Design a protein with these regions (language model features):
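Active-site phosphate-binding strand-loop segment of PLP-dependent enzymes
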Residues: 186-243
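A short helix-loop-beta submotif of the ANL/AMP-binding
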Residues: 175-181
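Short, Lys/Arg-enriched N-terminal segments with co-localized hydrophobic residues
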Residues: 14, 18-42
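N-terminal small-domain helix-loop-helix segment of the aminotransferase-like
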Residues: 45-140, 147
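Short acidic capping loops at alpha-helix termini that bridge into adjacent secondary structure
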Residues: 129-135, 155-158, 205
Length: 243
């Protein structure tokens, strides 16, 4: 009975964890018994999960929806979504795949035809050679990034993250047990990659750096010279570039 009770408590109140993290003061004031639920949930979660903060972008999504429901015209900058629908050729291909019963398990690392197409793209557009066994397919960007961080980083490691950054980077690193080390890209420099700041942040504990270009959210495009210098630093100090 104790196990069932804990499961019921978890499933009934886990949604409160998110809301408490976003606006806990309001909830504590409005419902006197919320604290009990929150404490029960905390006891069930590991320390690494307790360390993770909900994405601010998703919290704003709820706020935007609420304002729009009130008839307020809102421009949302929190999510990187295009202002147009999925192109028809993509919709048609997805439907055709379903109709062809392509709905079963694939090879864990991804469909071979897709991996071969990616290798061809890299050779044509980037002049680099990859083999299909060096390619893994993920569901979107977040899953393979989390996989990479969890595979490479652990407690005692440091991961450099140039900021402003995608909010999920910091939480991914914390989830692995490693420590995020933030290096500010300056607005007065057009948010260019702060290579000098990265140099100062490197320590014997540095395991990786997480970057993307164009940067999310600033849109800054790092130059070939900056990226070459970063690659040289990675080789010199033996850390990974996760991008």
């Amino acid at each position: 009975m104790n196990i069932i009770s804990k499961k019921e408590t978890f499933y009934n109140y886990i949604h409160l964890w998110y809301h408490l993290s976003i606006n806990k003061n309001e909830l504590f004031e409005s419902q006197g018994n919320i604290k009990t639920y929150r404490e029960e949930i905390i006891m069930m979660l590991t320390k690494r999960i307790q360390n993770i903060k909900p994405a601010a972008t998703l919290a704003l999504t709820g706020k935007v929806a609420e304002l729009r429901k009130q008839g307020i015209d809102v421009i949302a900058f929190n999510l990187g979504e295009p202002d147009f629908g999925t192109p028809q050729n993509i919709c048609d291909a997805a439907k055709a795949a379903i109709d062809a019963q392509k709905t079963k398990y694939t090879v864990v690392s991804g469909i071979m035809d897709l991996k071969e197409a990616i290798c061809a793209k890299f050779l044509k557009d980037n002049n680099v050679v990859y083999k299909p066994n060096e390619i893994c397919i993920g569901t979107g960007a977040k899953q393979p990034l989390v996989n990479a961080v969890l595979a490479l980083c652990e407690e005692g490691d440091e991961v450099i993250i140039p900021t402003p950054c995608w909010v999920s980077y910091i939480e991914m690193v914390k989830l692995s047990g490693a420590t995020p080390v933030l290096v500010q890209n300056r607005e007065e420099d057009g948010f260019a990659l702060n290579v000098e700041g990265i140099k100062k942040a490197i320590t014997p504990k540095t395991k990786a750096i997480m970057i993307n270009t164009p940067n999310n959210p600033t849109g800054a495009v790092y130059t070939k010279e900056q990226l070459t210098e970063l690659a040289e630093l990675a080789c010199k100090h033996d850390f990974y570039i996760i991008s």
